[in-house]
Amino acid sequence: MKKLASFLALLLFVATACDNEKVVDETKLPVNAQDYIEAHFPNARISQVVRDRDDLETSYDVILDNQVKLEFDKKGDCYSIESRRTEKLPDTVIPLKVLEYVQEHYPDAFITDWEKDKTDQEIRLSDSKELVFNLAGTFLRIDD
């Protein structure tokens, strides 16, 4: 009986662990995420959506057919965008103050990645520099 209980507990653990990441249909994306993609990447199609459940958090990883990867929280708010190093992100996805700083200080470069967390936001430029800004868009430092 003990072995059966242990086996069932292990089976339950494995089953729930396997459900952490799951490929889902794009209709399962929050409406805000669908609207965001349509507004900022109108010529791209969604190739894959992966729902990630970790503890009490749910997020969505979206890969577009142009190889751009976006990450959304459970409400559909975008917090990360990655492109190929040769691809410029649309200006509309970058906060205006960050975009203006880059245009003024790095006129020959463009933004390829953007990520926001609870305390700051970080971008990667086409020349591989990584710049860190606070949430209001004020430049803080170059990240090595």
What is the predicted role of each segment?
Residues V14-A17:
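C-terminal motif of bacterial Sec signal peptides marking the signal peptidase cleavage site
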Residues K2-A9:
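Sec-dependent signal peptide recognition
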Residues K69-S83, E130-D143:
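A short, surface-exposed beta-strand/turn
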Residues Y60-V62, Q121-E130:
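Conserved histidines in hydrophobic membrane contexts and catalytic metal-binding motifs
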Residues T112-D117:
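Residue-level detector of conserved, function-critical positions
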